[in-house]
């Protein structure tokens, strides 16, 4: 399983139950670094939908973290803190964070994630599509376009706010460890 090829101490950081499809969605904390990964490759968070009664995976989606070279406001985003499902709007709210503390440039964002239009990649043969074992080993600058050419799409996201920019206390790095509706 690709999940055994993750960074040490980087498991499923958050889970959210989707009351619309009755699946439990698990968000891996940090981008995985499978064999072939190079610095500068895509920062992908995997989202696994599991039947909570049987533990059987039902779907898997790819969530692309913003790259530090795309936007300075997203520099350092490397972790998912928590997730919650909003049944009224059919979206997930997740927190992104970096490891900074005590700095107004710290990134502690809350982001809305929508699976509408995202491709279920569970059991995808990446070797056939990308000539690689996993999409994480693909170059960041062309991954999204090349996958779209194969009709594979990432989750959609809307950045809602960054806690430090709202005046939140900056004394610790894990201020977005919990979300609730």
Please give the residue ranges for each predicted region.
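Sequence/structural signature of beta-propeller domains
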Residues: 1-181
């Amino acid at each position: 399983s690709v999940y055994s090829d993750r960074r040490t101490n980087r498991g499923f950081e958050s889970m959210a139950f989707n009351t619309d499809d009755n699946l439990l969605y698990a968000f891996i904390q940090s981008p995985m670094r499978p064999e072939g990964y190079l610095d500068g490759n895509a920062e992908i968070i995997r989202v696994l939908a599991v039947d909570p009664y049987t533990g059987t995976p039902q779907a898997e989606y790819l969530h692309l973290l913003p790259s530090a070279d795309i936007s300075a406001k997203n520099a350092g985003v490397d972790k998912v803190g928590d997730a919650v499902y909003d049944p009224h709007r059919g979206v997930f709210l997740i927190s992104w964070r970096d490891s900074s503390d005590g700095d107004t440039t710290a990134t502690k964002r809350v982001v809305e994630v929508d699976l509408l239009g995202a491709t279920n990649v569970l059991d995808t043969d990446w070797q056939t599509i990308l000539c690689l074992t996993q999409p994480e080993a693909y170059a960041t600058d062309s991954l999204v376009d090349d996958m779209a050419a194969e009709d594979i799409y990432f989750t959609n996201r809307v950045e809602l706010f960054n806690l430090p920019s709202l005046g939140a206390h900056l004394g610790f790095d894990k201020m977005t460890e919990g979300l609730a509706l």
